[in-house]
Amino acid sequence: MIWNDHSDLRGCHAFLSPSQSRWLRYDMEKLEQVYLNMQAKERGTKIHELASQLIEFGIGLPKNHKTLNMFVNDAIGYGMESERVLYYSANCFGTADAISYSEKFKRVRIHDLKSGLIPAKMDQLAVYAALFCLEYNKKPKDLEIIMRIYQFDDILEERPESDYIDEIIDQIVISDKTLNKIGGR
């Protein structure tokens, strides 16, 4: 047999992939919905990459009330790092869209850019705050923690109580120990 050459597709996955065959049970409306969601996710990834590069190079955007512009301009204005990995263990780590820490003011600022249609929750940012405390040996009660979500051309801001971050820290530590006992990383 002389096989057709598709070497350029190695490592790629088709939307109608045999290994992800649940699409066989979709009606055309569901197929369309899942496909559009996948495209939105890919668009969100590209927007995050663009935002990260703009922040890294200090290139601001026009000042207006557009989500991307506010996120990029605020991150640059607050001297934030883009796409910073926060690590506790192989079982628990994540990448903050933008983060900064001021030793002088004992302030950690965590910003998250959301491009999806589902309203975001602050839980993700609170976990980043907990990871920051664990990795850099900081106590939440000694910090001012500012968390912001940029979505729908708006900014949501919370300043969590230290007890809440302590609870997340405890949950991370306990969950990590449990996973390690049962053969996690």
Describe these PLM feature segments:
Residues 177-185:
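Accessory terminal regions of nucleic-acid processing enzymes
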Residues 145-146:
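A beta-hairpin/wing motif
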Residues 114-116, 151-152:
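Short, solvent-exposed aromatic-acidic interface loops
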Residues 1-50:
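Charged, glycine-rich intrinsically disordered N-terminal tails and low-complexity linkers that flank
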Residues 126-133:
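Short, well-ordered amphipathic alpha-helices
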Residues 33-109, 116-123, 135-142, 156-160, ...:
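Catalytic cores of nuclease domains that cleave nucleic-acid phosphodiester backbones
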Residues 149-157:
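Short, conserved secondary-structure transition motifs
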